[in-house]
Structures are given as structure tokens and as C-alpha cells.
């Protein structure tokens, strides 16, 4: 795959079954590794082996400096295994910029009869800085009335051991209005020096 403004992780398998309401929880808290984004121009590929195992990787650079001496590239690799009721994905990324940073991330899921649990953990190691970590855990209930219910908890960012940790909590309910339209009301609380609380309704369409 080659594309402009295309995420490297677009070819990743991942192992997060959680339907996130807020952006940070969208990759089970591993948005810099398993959910690696783009620097501009991206080349990536993946290969799925028999038995549920897959490998993927890619590189992304700014359009004006592809692999140039002035370093502003991103590189990532992912290995994943998925089965009928569980999965796990491990990813590494190296992101260059003002501060070069490497990330390791792991996310996984397990489906019970009544719910699916998803979890993720990520480490962040900036050059010359302290190692930071973050985590996520969420539950998805696929049959609650006519829709699905999701509830999750995550650190609001990756934190060093000396940092004050803040957490984000969310809950949402997604239900189809018809074959092409889904409504998702949700609520979230994001801790900080001043806590933020919000309620929103998202509408998605498929054609």
C-alpha cells in the first residue's frame, strides 16, 4: 500500500474489539504503536499466514523530505494473532521529529458469551527523556436491547513514574436506526487539573 496522508497502521491487524467513543480509546490505548499514524507519504505492507498469524510494517515521511538527512520519518512493525474468540497484537514504532521517540504497544481481546474484554498497554521512550507508560481496559456488551453497550477506562496519556496520572472514563450505547444509520449517545469524564465531563451523540452512515 502506498498513499498520501495514510496511516501506517491501516494495514495492521490489531486486536482491539472495543467500540471507542473518545479518540484516545480508539486503539485500546496504543495509538502510537498499534495505531501508528502518518507523517505524509506512506508505504506499508502486510502478510497473513495460515492459522491466524499476521505481520505488517511500513514507513512514512514528509512529502518534501522522504528519508532525507533531516529526520522526520515514522517506522512501524506489527505482529498479531487472531482466533475466533481471542486475539493479541504487538507493535513497535520509531517516530522521528523534534524529539525522536520509540514506542512498544500490546493490545488484546477475549470474547465471553455475554461480553468482550479488550485491553492495551503502551510504553513511550523519548531520546533523553523518561520512559512513560499508559493503559486501557474496556468491556463491550454486544446484545443490550437493540444495540451494543461499551464502557472503558484509560490513562489520559502516557505518564512517567514521577508524573501525576489522570484517567479518562467513558460509556456509550450504539444502536441502528436502519440499515444505513447508527446513533451512539455517550458520556465521558477526563481527569486533569480541572476535570472535563461531556455528553454527545454521534451519528454514522453507511452506504
Q: What role is predicted for each listed range?
A:
Residues 1-62, 71-73, 80-87, 138-143, ...:
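Outer membrane beta-barrel
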Residues 3-9, 62-64, 95-97, 124-126, ...:
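Structural signature of outer-membrane beta-barrel domains
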Residues 31-33, 67, 78, 127, ...:
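Outer-membrane beta-barrel proteins
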Residues 72-168:
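Detector for outer-membrane/organellar transmembrane beta-barrel domains
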Residues 150-152, 181-187:
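Conserved active-site loop/cleft motifs that coordinate metal ions or position small ligands
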Residues 166-169, 184-186:
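Sequence/fold signature of self-assembling virion shell proteins
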Residues 175, 195-207:
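Outer-membrane beta-barrel "beta-signal"
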Amino acid at each position: 500500500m502506498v498513499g498520501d496522508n495514510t496511516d501506517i497502521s491501516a494495514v495492521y491487524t490489531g486486536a482491539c474489539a472495543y467500540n471507542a467513543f473518545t479518540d484516545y480509546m480508539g486503539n485500546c490505548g496504543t495509538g502510537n504503536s498499534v495505531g501508528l499514524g502518518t507523517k505524509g507519504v506512506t508505504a506499508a505492507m502486510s502478510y497473513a499466514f495460515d492459522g491466524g498469524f499476521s505481520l505488517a510494517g511500513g514507513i512514512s515521511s514528509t512529502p518534501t523530505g522522504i528519508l532525507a538527512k533531516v529526520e522526520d520519518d515514522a517506522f512501524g512493525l506489527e505482529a498479531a494473532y487472531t482466533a475466533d474468540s481471542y486475539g493479541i497484537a504487538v507493535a513497535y514504532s520509531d517516530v522521528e521529529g523534534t524529539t525522536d521517540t520509540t514506542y512498544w504497544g500490546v493490545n488484546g481481546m477475549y470474547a465471553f458469551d455475554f461480553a468482550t474484554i479488550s485491553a492495551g498497554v503502551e510504553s513511550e521512550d523519548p531520546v533523553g527523556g523518561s520512559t512513560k507508560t499508559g493503559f486501557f481496559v474496556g468491556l463491550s456488551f454486544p446484545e443490550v436491547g437493540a444495540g451494543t453497550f461499551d464502557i472503558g477506562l484509560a490513562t489520559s496519556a502516557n505518564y512517567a513514574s514521577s508524573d501525576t496520572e489522570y484517567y479518562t472514563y467513558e460509556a456509550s450505547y450504539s444502536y441502528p436506526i436502519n440499515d444505513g444509520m447508527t446513533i451512539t449517545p455517550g458520556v465521558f469524564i477526563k481527569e486533569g487539573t480541572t476535570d472535563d465531563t461531556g455528553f454527545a451523540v454521534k451519528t454514522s452512515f453507511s452506504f
